[in-house]
Swiss-Prot record:
UniProt catalytic activity: L-seryl-[protein] + ATP = O-phospho-L-seryl-[protein] + ADP + H(+); L-threonyl-[protein] + ATP = O-phospho-L-threonyl-[protein] + ADP + H(+)
Predominant localisation class: cytoplasm
Name used for this protein in its record: Casein kinase II subunit alpha
Oligomer status and interactors: Tetramer of two alpha and two beta chains.
Native source organism of the sequence: Theileria parva
Tree of life domain: Eukaryota
Gene3D superfamilies: Phosphorylase Kinase, domain 1, Transferase(Phosphotransferase) domain 1
InterPro entries with a match to the protein in the record: CK2_alpha, Kinase-like_dom_sf, Prot_kinase_dom, Protein_kinase_ATP_BS, Ser/Thr_kinase_AS
Residues that, per the record, bind ATP: I61, G62, R63, G64, K65, F66, S67, E68, V69, K84
GO BP terms in the entry: regulation of cell cycle
Catalytic-site annotation from UniProt: D172 (proton acceptor)
Length: 348
């Protein structure tokens, strides 16, 4: 079944519905219009590539659709680094990632881009990043105390708020892209390859994010989304960690993903969401979806996770995991949530 089978794709029906305005984000809607094209027009930048002579590969540490990632060493300073060797992709995409990393440089908990290099023979481009002594999330998350969880989610929200305040959506928040050095209590948000500048009333690709962390807007082909997509992904992460159920919404494909969400959040609010934005259910959708009532978070509590669950965290999840993207809590609002009181009180 094609993604478009899930929504009415009648070409005569324009989204959004004629009687509905596109609802702009609560905050940071006009950041890029204020900063001007020299800030966001990545297509017209000229990059100055250095030669990779100062870097040596030590070992492979990961791979993605668009790159291979290695631990490396700067042979001059002897410092560890991370070398991201880019696979052949459109120059535009490479320019976008670099421009975004340059714009966010120095922001809280954002991975630092140290250098950009290109091999003179192969012309293969690589990005050089600071090294983080990361523990794999599958090993780390089950060991975290509630204090640890509060601390790291707060640090992630801090990175997210900064990113949004600079007019940028990450669009691929997931455990694999959150590096944690647990010994030093350092968190870094990585992989800005899908990140994009937010411009009001612009259509965006829904082929972003990773299935388990995709917001409902992506699953129903709602292209006028905004920063709030990222808060959904953080909500999925938080639910997964708290309830020890990672990933929390475990869909087998993009269609089943929405079914898994509906089985928790219910179908009533999903229908309201469709109605509000002038979307129509295609007949095939109802066959997959069925009708589900909203489940209380307490349904997911068991003896292995009950020490992590509190009324505060359940309230925060209620505010993050909302179908209607315009009604989700913002990162800044989330940082003020009572769930983080002890973090705020302990921070200088």
């Amino acid at each position: 079944m094609d993604q478009m089978d899930l929504v009415d794709t009648d070409k005569s029906r324009k989204y959004p519905a004629k009687d509905l305005k596109i609802i702009l984000p609560k905050t940071y809607a006009d950041v890029n219009s204020k900063k001007g094209p020299e800030y966001w027009d990545y297509e017209n930048i000229t990059l100055k590539w250095n030669v990779p002579d100062s870097y040596e590969i030590v070992r492979k540490i990961g791979r993605g659709k668009f790159s291979e990632v290695f631990e490396g060493i700067n042979t001059v300073t002897k410092d560890k680094c991370v070398i991201k060797i880019l696979k052949p992709v459109k120059k535009k995409k490479i320019k976008r990632e670099i421009k975004i990393l340059q714009n966010l440089r120095g922001g809280p908990n954002i991975i630092k881009l140290l250098d950009i290099v290109k091999d003179p023979q192969s012309r293969t481009p690589s990005l050089i990043f600071e090294h983080v002594n990361n523990t794999d999330f599958k090993t780390l998350y089950p060991t975290l105390s509630i204090q640890d969880i509060k601390y790291y989610i707060y640090q992630l929200l801090k990175a997210m708020n900064y990113c949004h305040s600079q007019g940028i959506m990450h669009r691929d928040i997931k455990p694999h892209n959150v590096m944690i050095d647990h010994e030093k209590k350092i968190l870094r948000l990585i992989d800005w390859g899908l990140a994009e500048f937010y411009h009001p009333e612009q259509e965006y690709s829904v082929r972003v994010a990773t299935r388990y962390y995709k917001g409902p807007e992506l699953l129903v082909d709602m292209r006028y989304y905004d920063y709030s997509l990222d808060i959904w992904s953080i909500g999925c992460m938080l639910a997964g960690i708290i309830f020890k159920k990672e990933p929390f919404f475990y869909g087998h494909d993009n269609y089943d993903q929405l079914v898994k969400i509906a089985k928790v959040l219910g179908t009533e609010d999903l229908h309201r969401y469709f109605e509000k934005y002038g979307l129509k259910f295609a007949p095939a959708y109802q066959e997959i979806l069925g009708n589900h009532s909203k489940k209380p978070w307490t349904k997911f509590v068991h003896h292995e996770n009950q020490h992590l669950v509190s009324p505060e965290v359940m309230d925060l999840l209620d505010r993050m995991l909302v179908y209607d993207h315009t009604k989700r809590i913002t990162p800044l609002e989330a940082m003020e949530h009572p769930f983080f009181n002890e973090i705020k009180n302990n921070s200088v």
